Every structure is written in C-alpha cells, then in structure tokens.
C-alpha cells in the first residue's frame, strides 16, 4: 500500500503500474473537500515513485463518483470570495498534477461520473467505461458552473459545441453517446473493465499509443477559427438565453467563460473558470437551487424511512377512468404495478385506456420503448365495469367527480368489495379526508392521495393523513407513490390540504387586483417574466379550468370563511357565468386555438374585457413590485400558517411541494427559501403596507416573531472553515 486515506487509496497493481482507487466508507464516492485534499496527498506519494510507468484510476463502488458533496455547498458558498477562489485554485492544482504525471493515465469508469467525478476523469489521458455509464456536468442546474476544470478540458476534448451542450444544460450522457462524442475511448463489460484499462495502459507504455499526443490538446487553446468561434458562441448564447432566461445566470456565464478562455492555454483558462465560478457561488439562485437539491434528498429520505417496514403494493386499482384515472393507471402500469381501472361508463373506460395508450405511444415515438414493451404495459391495465379483480388489489385510489356525495357512495361501496387489509385512497383535491372517511367501516385504512395533472409529468403526490388514518396506510400509499416514480409528501388533513390551500389565497390576490383595476395581461406578464412562474395566474386558471376553480373556491371559502370568504363578485364568477371555462372549451381569460402540433395556443380576446368591466373598477396601472407583493403575500402567509398548524411538517417539504406541485420558480427555492432570502423583517415591512386589503394580508403571529429577531426558517448555515487551509490538510 503506497497511500491510504479515508476515501481513497494508492497501490501497486503490476510492474510499474499504480492504481488509485476511490473507496469512501459510505455507499457512494463523492468528491468532497477532504477527498480532494486526500487526492493531493496520494499524488505527493505517486510523484516520488521512480519506477512508475502508468496509473489507473478506478472506483470500488457501483458508481465511480456521483459528484461533489452537495451537502458542503451552502457552507462553502458563505466563504469569502477570495478564500473560495484560493481553494478552487488549490483543487485545480491537484487535478493539474494528475493530468501532468510523466506517465500515461487511464480512468476505468463505471456507473455515475458526474460533476467533480467527470472533471476528475477528464484529467486522465484515457477513459474506459461500462455500459451503465452516466457522465456529465450538472453544475448549472445547481446555479453554478464546473469549477474543477470541466469548462476548460471538455471543450478541448469534444469541441466547443458538444461541450457547451452538456455544460449549459447540465446534462449527462450514457455510454454509447459518450463514446460517440469522444468523452470516453471505449465501452466494455463490467467484468472486463480493469483488464481492458490495463491493456490500453500497456499499449501506451509500450509506445503503441501516443498518450502525449492525446494529452496535448487539453493543455492548449481551443482549435477554432475566428469564423467558427463567432458562429459557435453566438448560437450557443442565443439558445441559452432562450431556454434558461435571465433568472438562471449560470448557463450563460459558463458559455461566456468557455468563449473567453478559448484562445488561452490550460492554466490561464482555469483562472477564468475560477473567476466566473466564485461570483456564481455567492448568488441567491445558487443557494436556492442547491437548497432544492438538498430538500429533494430530505423528502426522498423521509419517504424511504416511512416505507422501510412495509411491502410495496403489487396490485392496484383506480376508480373512475377518464383523463385523470387513465393517467394514474398508466403511471402505475408503466412502473410495474398492474392496475384494474373501473368506471360505470364504457365511454369513460375507453377514454381512460385511450389516455394510457396515447402516453405509451409517445414513448414509442421517442424510441424509449418498442412495440413489445408497449403491449406488455397496456396488458397490465384491466378495464372493468364491475368489481372483478378488486379482491386481489392492495390499494385502490378513487378518482371520480369532485363531489363529496358521489365520492362517499363510491368509497363505501368499494370498501365492501376489497379485502379487509386493502388500502383505500381518494384523489380529491379539496374535500377533507376525515369527512370522506365518515362513511367507512375501516377509516384507518383510508387516506388522501392527491395527484397533479398531467399525472405523468407532475412529480408531486400529496398523501393526506385523515383523523383516523393509520401509519401503515400512509406507509403503503407512500410506497406506491414512490414506486410510481413520484415524490410523495405527507400532509395533515384540512380543506385543500397543503397545495390548494395555499394556491387559492394567491388566486384571491389576483381577483382583488382585477377588482381594483389591474389588467390580467400585465399581471400574467409580471408573474411570469419578473417573478418567474411558468404561467401567470390568468393562464393557470384557464389551464386548471374556471369551473373547477369556481367550485374549489367555494370549498375553500367554506373551510376558511374568515380569510377566504369574499363579499364581492369576482372575475372567476364572471367568467364562470359566461360559460368561459378556460382551455377545456377554448375560452377563459384567454382564447385558445390548436397549433400545428394540436396543442392549445393562447390568444387575446377583447370580449373578456367587457365581462371583467362588470366586476372591476376603472383600469389603472400597478407597478411590477405592487403586483408581485399583492399576489405573493396571501400565498406566503398561508404557507406559514400551514407550517404553524402542522399541516406540513417542515419548510423543506413545503418548498418541495410548491416547486413540484405548482411550479414555484426553482431559482427562488420555494416559499420559505424566498422568505429567508428576502428576510423576515423585510417581508413584514412589505406585508404591512397591504394589510388594509383584508385578512389574507395579515401576517401570522409566528412570522411576526421571526421578523422581530429577523430569524430564518431554514437552520442557519455556518461558513466552511477557511478552505484555503485545506492545502495543508
């Protein structure tokens, strides 16, 4: 053994060939700050070996290196810029030393090589991979850019276009694509990986492969003519601005850095990467996006913990076909849980099966599946008009019309048709679960399971605990949702649960703005372009359905009369009375026509102004800041109330439910992250300017207490120790 650290070791393999093996104590290798320092120490030893002829880099885990340790990021981002820059310089000096070894080097890469893991293997001369490889640089999705030389080495290896496509989008690619673009030199079976890597290394040592020529382009400026460079970077910048937009500075910064470094050698180019990385790491966007990653891990970890002692349902059933039922049935079958889909109408069953078939056909068209797989999945969805097959299902989700009487009747009838241990769930979006449970003999086996439309795209499933719901029931439904590839978040029961409860105060803020003379077009524009929502409130209401929103608004008003009962006729009422139900019938706030792809495209419709004039004061202009404040304060206040009342368990779960269920702009990180970034004291000052607008604008007492001490909702993060000192670690 030449060197042994906590996460890697260095050993002789055979005659003059050393192996450097990443082998962290946990289940995966991460390139954390300690591992980077340890890599430097291993290289100290390696550089002193006079008999060294070659070096093989590999991993002892199922994945090579999953990336940097993102749990370190928030504390690293708080380190002063100069110190962070120093540490990056130190880290890059380690990778440069790996690249500059006076012998040929190869990485034997299995599984994931992401972020720092990818940057590490880019520093070796050759890369041999297994078929399960996923390699790439996802940093821009975390609000930063590659910091260990990825933006320097990858363009010089692959060419600017291929590298920018991976770096700007935060992409990873599989083995076949990686070999095609030159990111790896070959792909072999896992059992042949080390043997194959050694064979390449021996050829390089013997002079059959020119490893110095392979290394040289990574040390030199990018080989691009002036015209090629102009075209390449102009197109890339245009595309990045179009897709990422102004709210995500990392992708455009990465492209501009690659452009600026194109005519420089490696060491000067790395200085530019350093200069670009450090300011990005100090942005609110980076903190928010890293926060989302960490929250996602927290939520998924909680789901794993909840389900560790229960068996995942093997057979499921859906009550109510149609678009939603068909979507749930498809998702369950697609992920390997056969499903019985029941409806009382042949027409609805056909609609549900058509929806499932349509989604499978899309997978077929994209080349994700073949005809055999399509037939196999569709055959596991059994459409029935009666209860045949219900005696063998483990879980049933009801997705019939949003009417308490209908739902109660269907649930009570179904309870008599299933085994005593079968779990029942309702896909209601607003009706309290404890109310629906009142007709059941086994309320402990019942909970809410709120999917979001379209089911196959929306990651969130709210799992709602009723008054009498057992822990085992919650665990089984969470297990099924996880098996379906969803992110389940457990919430306690109340009208609207969490997501709809906080959405309708937002819609109420919108209605009040319209009442006071604001133009819905401007509101949509401000909330989309300035705040960053994927859809403005008018557009979102049209997509949800004005009739659906009108009904849900009444349910929410009955549930929270003090705040959500209104004493005026609003825009939703006016459109509902005029039979303008949104996208579903082509007329809402906007008019909809099908585009060439058969998707609804919104257009302006002057008729709506006349309808809104009846429920609005004369038109007046509001500033962007006023619109954002009046829209967001009711939502934020309600989110805080939900935390204070125990409807949602933590700020992390609240933020993930908003991002995954409503499309809350990820660069804000969610409601609590946005609140912490703004500062509770500043938020209180802003909200108090609008408290005359009514109870929705009154800040909850718990938030007032936080504001008095300017406390955050997320635990305070301490800056990492002066990371420049890691040079001597």
From Swiss-Prot:
InterPro entries linked: 3-OHacyl-CoA_DH_CS, 3-OHacyl-CoA_DH_NAD-bd, 3HC_DH_C, 6-PGluconate_DH-like_C_sf, ClpP/crotonase-like_dom_sf, Enoyl-CoA_hyd/isom_CS, Enoyl-CoA_hydra/iso, FA_oxidation_alpha_subunit
A cellular component annotation (GO) from this entry: fatty acid beta-oxidation multienzyme complex
Annotated region described as 3-hydroxyacyl-CoA dehydrogenase, given as residue ranges: 311-729
Gene Ontology molecular functions: 3-hydroxybutyryl-CoA epimerase activity; delta(3)-delta(2)-enoyl-CoA isomerase activity; enoyl-CoA hydratase activity; long-chain-3-hydroxyacyl-CoA dehydrogenase activity; NAD+ binding
Catalytic residues in the record: 450 (for 3-hydroxyacyl-coa dehydrogenase activity)
UniProt keyword annotations, A-Z: Fatty acid metabolism, Isomerase, Lipid degradation, Lipid metabolism, Lyase, Multifunctional enzyme, NAD, Oxidoreductase
Site, as annotated: Important for catalytic activity: 119, 139
Annotated family: In the N-terminal section; belongs to the enoyl-CoA hydratase/isomerase family.
NCBIfam families: FadB, PRK11730.1
Main function: Involved in the aerobic and anaerobic degradation of long-chain fatty acids via beta-oxidation cycle. Catalyzes the formation of 3-oxoacyl-CoA from enoyl-CoA via L-3-hydroxyacyl-CoA. It can also use D-3-hydroxyacyl-CoA and cis-3-enoyl-CoA as substrate.
Protein name: Fatty acid oxidation complex subunit alpha
Species of the source: Enterobacter cloacae
Taxonomy of the source species: Bacteria, Pseudomonadati, Pseudomonadota, Gammaproteobacteria, Enterobacterales
Gene: fadB
